[in-house]
């Protein structure tokens, strides 16, 4: 019976993890752009994401979720910084015509994909709130199966992120030979617009939280 419950729980974690990676967000947009000149960009972004996510996961497991839930001003400040960063990132991408020029983008735009994974995760208030709410439920349930299963659940969760990032990057690499000039421009503008929308949302919602 315990084995069935564990299998069902792992299935639940897989579904939750897949729903997260399939939802378009700043990390996805950044991965798409970076993948044009680096087929391992998705993996690197995922590593950066994990550098922030694993310590937060441990904090939630240690009982710190309530701290995040009860400190809206802190989350709001993170949202303001994150929103400003996304606006900067989005405007840079919107204006950078060399984004899909492999030689120029390698030295100019791409920098460190790991760092982008870290910053876009660290300054994403929605990510922190997810772990303080939905993530708390996952962690609490995982603890009923023991510490080993708890750590295994995080590994499974991250492997979903990693698999999605690698798949996205390799897909972009395979498809880029078919990109027409106009299609490259459309992809750049769509990704930039997505990042800008999230930037505005993080910024305005965080300011509203502080003002309320």
Task: List the predicted regions and their residue ranges.
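Hydrophobic alpha-helical transmembrane segments in multi-pass integral membrane proteins
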Residues: 59-61, 122-132, 195-209
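Short alpha-helical transmembrane interface motifs in multi-pass membrane proteins
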Residues: 11-16, 84-87, 116-119, 156-157
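Selected transmembrane alpha-helices and immediately adjacent juxtamembrane segments
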Residues: 2, 111, 115-134
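Juxtamembrane transmembrane-helix termini in multi-pass membrane transport proteins
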Residues: 3-76, 133-153
